[in-house]
């Protein structure tokens, strides 16, 4: 997409093993997929194994039109076993010692990062020393003017205070959900109700935007100028896998296109609500959602 804003998802790329079959996943990958659908020049920095699952991922990314900075390494391609509860809420078992635990960005990936308008990352891929170092160093190469989106994505035991603190220091956008914000508050000794905690986090860090998503209970966007709250649309939920990642993509697309905060928020909410009505994390977005 010549002339489009350049965005990166760096971190895990994997197969979500859902009850009905496997789906391409990983939060930064889902973000990149939806960002591409929203007209951004989208890329993924990650790793896959030298196996059939890895080759399938590379082919999927290519067919989706996403720029691939995905290395093949001597580890198995990542998988996540997912079971859905009666409300379509996923429970994850994230397998360890896999390819995306050994991310080493190529020279071409770093060159792309040097020109990036936004980069999205989380805690999960930083569970290993190799990928932690690679992600932290890649963040240093992104222009100061870029959006550095820390979509915290706390999973299982794969996060700690050091990862969160060092990531937040490099971020200027934080996305966090209603469960994660309570864990965050406990780790960093922040007290108060949800709204007070949200504002303390925003005030204590150099953030342009804080996004708090609360599932069926709505969402907040906080900026220096205003707060925006929106209810979650009442939709028939197939599953919620990838809904938060699509919200992040909508948020980033709106910010890069300099839209008003309320308009950005509405778009992000509508995108994530649609994703909840579909199976898997990366359904094709209808045109009216992308406008």
Predicted feature locations:
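Ribokinase/PfkB-type carbohydrate-kinase core domain
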Residues: 1-8, 60-62, 68-70, 86-226, ...
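Conserved phosphate-binding/catalytic region of the ribokinase-like
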Residues: 1-5, 192-291
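Substrate-binding N-lobe of the ribokinase-like
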Residues: 6-7, 17-89, 96-102, 291
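Glycine/charged-rich beta-loop-alpha catalytic/anionic-binding loops adjacent to active sites
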Residues: 9-18, 62, 226-236
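Cofactor-binding loop segments of dinucleotide-utilizing enzymes, especially the Rossmann-like FAD-
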Residues: 12, 46-50, 153
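Nucleotide phosphate-binding site architecture
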Residues: 15-16, 182, 282
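Short, conserved phosphate/pyrophosphate- and ester-handling motifs at nucleotide-, phospho-/glycolipid
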Residues: 35, 177, 244
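Hydrophobic packing within well-folded, soluble alpha/beta domains
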Residues: 35, 44, 61, 119, ...
């Amino acid at each position: 997409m010549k002339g489009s804003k350049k965005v990166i998802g760096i971190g895990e790329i994997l197969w979500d093993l859902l009850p009905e079959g496997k789906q391409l996943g990983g939060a930064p990958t889902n973000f990149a997929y939806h960002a591409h659908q929203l007209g951004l020049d989208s890329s993924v920095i990650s790793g896959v194994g030298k196996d059939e699952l890895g080759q399938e991922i590379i082919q999927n990314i290519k067919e989706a039109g996403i720029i691939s900075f995905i290395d093949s390494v001597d580890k198995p391609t990542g998988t996540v076993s997912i079971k859905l509860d009666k409300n379509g809420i996923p429970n994850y078992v994230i397998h360890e010692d896999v390819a995306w635990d050994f991310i080493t960005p190529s020279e071409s990936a770093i060159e792309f990062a040097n020109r990036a308008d936004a980069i999205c990352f989380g805690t999960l891929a930083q569970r290993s020393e190799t990928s932690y170092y690679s992600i932290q160093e890649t963040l240093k190469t992104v222009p100061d003017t870029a959006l550095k989106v820390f979509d915290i994505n706390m999973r299982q035991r794969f996060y700690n205070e050091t990862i969160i603190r060092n990531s937040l220091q490099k971020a200027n956008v934080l996305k966090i959900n209603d469960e994660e914000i309570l864990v965050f508050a406990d780790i960093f000794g922040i007290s108060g109700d949800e709204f007070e905690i949200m504002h303390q986090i925003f005030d204590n860090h150099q953030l342009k935007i804080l996004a708090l998503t609360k599932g069926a209970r709505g969402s907040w966007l906080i900026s220096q100028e205003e707060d925006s709250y929106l209810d979650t649309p009442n939709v028939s939920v197939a599953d919620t896998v990838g809904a938060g990642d699509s919200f992040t993509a909508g948020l980033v697309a709106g910010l890069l296109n300099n839209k008003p905060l309320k308009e950005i928020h509405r778009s992000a909410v509508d995108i994530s609500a649609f994703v909840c009505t579909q199976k898997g994390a990366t359904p094709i977005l209808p045109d009216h959602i992308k406008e």
